[in-house]
Amino acid sequence: MANVVVVGAQWGDEGKGKIVDWLSERADVIARFQGGHNAGHTLVIDGKVYKLNALPSGVVRGGKLSVIGNGVVLDPWHLIKEIDIIRGQGVDISPETLMIAENTPLILPIHGELDRAREEAASKGTKIGTTGRGIGPAYEDKVGRRSVRVADLADTATLEARVDRALQHHDPLRKGLGIEPVDRDALVAQLVEIAPHILKYAAPVWKVLNEKRRAGKRILFEGAQGALLDIDFGTYPFVTSSNVIAGQAATGVGVGPGAINYVLGIVKAYTTRVGEGPFPAELDDADGQRLGERGHEFGTVTGRKRRCGWFDAVLVRQTCATSGVNGIALTKLDVLDGFETLKICVGYELDGKRMDYLPTAADHQARCRPIYEEMPGWSDSTEGARSWADLPANAIKYVRRVEELIDCPVALLSTSPEREDTILVTDPFAD
């Protein structure tokens, strides 16, 4: 049976939640493999809106196993709150439908405090634009081998030792930032209190998933954010603190790379970005405002207004290469309805030279200027289209040109937030 990885191929907010939900109906397991609760998914099912940050999108589908892998950093208090909210919407969540990898690092209150203090202390031009939820510092502790992990919650003595090790690092850091030392006993008490609520979902996820694979079950690997926020291949330092590209799916849950049969890149028909960092095709004019208003471009987590621009084929071609994308799901095509002329970024001008990729150095990225190709728009609506025959001729030409420029075919086309408004070209789950 084919297993599918879903990754964002831009800066996040591409519409992954809808596509994952659309695919999850045919998957047996849905697994989150990286990120934290800094990335939000909005799902619309039968007119009901679900907003998820920490939970995999599969939880709203009955009879599926949802998994939070070791590549995720988990805020246990946020997770329990989110579970309660989703349960209140009539969704059943139990240890039979949700598993958390025992080796998943936890986000502690000290991580959020450090995250926010650093952003406040940063001078203009050095702010990353984080959500302030502690994801970056939690990953720092993971790499620094001082994380409190899910399994540590099962034994108080081990838990206290882990907390003490973390505070040896955090207290001097906090002193330098002018923050009070951590109340060690209060933190331990908080963790002891939350422990039973988390431990009932704890499992050796690597073992469970490998058994599911041998049994021929279909696994859908769900990424958060977007490949341009990848810690290695994104617009560093304006990136997230984890690997976002498809290769992380294997290490983020504990399966081999051979478990991945198809990589689906989610791509918006235009470009958006939240927070700081380079954005060559950004629009500060009426067209950019129109894209933002029509696309309802406000962050699910922060409510921050997203920066908007024309479709950047250079960036998407690059992320399709680094993630090994087999096909893309092109979303929000309907937002482009009514534009008389559309532009696609097909290259950059950097210090008088033409570039066909985004350079690595941050100062070079900041100086890249877009080279555009113009295409005629369309006046008819594409919203709700469910077949190619429903699309205006110029919309089809736009999609075909995108395919040519990014060297990757369109596998799915999304024309509204409703999961049924999807045109299937290639089935990612096909064996």
From Swiss-Prot:
EC number: 6.3.4.4
Sites where the protein binds GTP: 12-18, 40-42, 306, 332-334, 414-416
Classification via InterPro entries: Adenylosuccin_syn_GTP-bd, Adenylosuccin_syn_Lys_AS, Adenylosuccinate_synth_dom1, Adenylosuccinate_synth_dom2, Adenylosuccinate_synth_dom3, Adenylosuccinate_synthetase, P-loop_NTPase
Pathway(s) of this molecule: Purine metabolism; AMP biosynthesis via de novo pathway; AMP from IMP: step 1/2
Protein name (Swiss-Prot/TrEMBL): Adenylosuccinate synthetase
GO biological process: 'de novo' AMP biosynthetic process; IMP metabolic process
Enzyme class: ligase
Keyword GTP-binding in annotation: yes
Residues annotated for substrate binding in this entry: 300-306
The keyword Hydrolase appears for this protein: no
Catalytic activity: IMP + L-aspartate + GTP = N(6)-(1,2-dicarboxyethyl)-AMP + GDP + phosphate + 2 H(+)
Native organism: Roseobacter denitrificans (strain ATCC 33942 / OCh 114) (Erythrobacter sp. (strain OCh 114))
Binding site for Mg(2+): 13, 40
Domain of life: Bacteria
Keywords recorded for this protein, A-Z: Cytoplasm, GTP-binding, Ligase, Magnesium, Metal-binding, Nucleotide-binding, Purine biosynthesis
Principal location: cytoplasm
GO molecular function list: adenylosuccinate synthase activity; GTP binding; magnesium ion binding
Function field: Plays an important role in the de novo pathway of purine nucleotide biosynthesis. Catalyzes the first committed step in the biosynthesis of AMP from IMP.
Record's subunit section: Homodimer.
Entry's localization field: Cytoplasm
